[in-house]
Amino acid sequence: MKKLYFAVGSQDLYGDECLRQVAEDSRQMAEFLNEKLKDIAEVELVPTIINSESCIKTMRQASCDDECVGVITWMHTFSPAKMWIKGLQELRKPLLHLHTQANEKLPYDSIDMDFMNLNQSAHGDREYGFIVARLGIPHEVVAGYYKHDDVVAKIRQFASVAKAISYSKSLKVASFGNNMREVAVTDGDRVESQIKYGWECNYFALGDLVDIINAVTEAEIDAKMKEYTDKYTMKTDRIDSVREQAKYEIGLEKFLAANGIGAFADTFQDLHGLKQLPGIAAQNLMAKGIGFGPEGDYKISALSAVLMKMSEGKEGATGFIEDYTYDLTQGQELELASHMLEVPPAFAATKPEIDVLPLGIGGKEDPARLIFDGVTGDGIQVTMVDMGDHFRLICADIELV
């Protein structure tokens, strides 16, 4: 289980009794957050940060712990921020500044300076926030009482993103063939992608994949066909074409698993040794969280894998689609999105049907694919392009109709 470190700031100026209370309040907060985030990551309380040495130790530990995907920080008392500098400079994991308080309400009838020194987040978090900004460290800020639903929702969002970033750092992408000939936007700098995002994108000979596909047994295909008929409606009588796709899915899954690969890209111009363009095979693998990019677009395959990891446990659907053509009726403008085959069943509003239909591109046999009515509702389209000196992430709010 991946985990988030919960690091609480204080100092030894206020004495042992104050620090004991800080530790107890921190324990209760960590237990509460752990319960609220347990489906995403475990929240692990680390010793209270009271000086530069303890900060350095904690941040180094977080950076070196493969199971730690991020750090949540909060200042219970005032915590002089110079003691955070060296530790934060060591941190290599996503950082959340939780600007909150152990108590929701003030005890107006009994409040005194002891209480105010102990519960000094309004002061301490500003000091801490200043030094994080001064250091130029990218981070998220969530403000509000930690038990409130809106605050919990934002912390959960950070946890999901941190988990996806961790996944991104170890993601391997397979390119079968190269970029579609003469196409610009699908291309990109693979070296820079690995530097920026951790994506290890390498070319693999299609022949190596074809060898694995051709070694798939009839018994394995029978089992995959049983899976298909359990999940989908068989609309075609061209069963041999469907069995061919089943063989592709089995072979692809074996190849990806053997090489620790979480995303792949192919192009219809380089499918030597395959009778069909992968249809159901690609659609089903996306349904299992494997990223896919057509026309050799390794960026989209990697990005979709990361977004699917980020969306785990959430309602809705995540998958690949491509912009195609417009309906420009005034006041009713629409865009029809599609692709040759590989729209994933995550977007299905109806039970998908398996059919075999002609495909007028690629020069291959008619492929088997899943066909379904699409879902409706609000969504976000996301893409990534390489602008030469930087990557650009483009997002658009959309409505699926």
Segments (PLM) and residue ranges:
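Anaerobic metallocofactor- and corrinoid-dependent redox/one-carbon enzyme cores
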Residues: H76, K93, H99, L106-A122, ...
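Metallocofactor- and cofactor-centric catalytic cores in central/energy metabolism, strongly enriched
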Residues: M1-A263
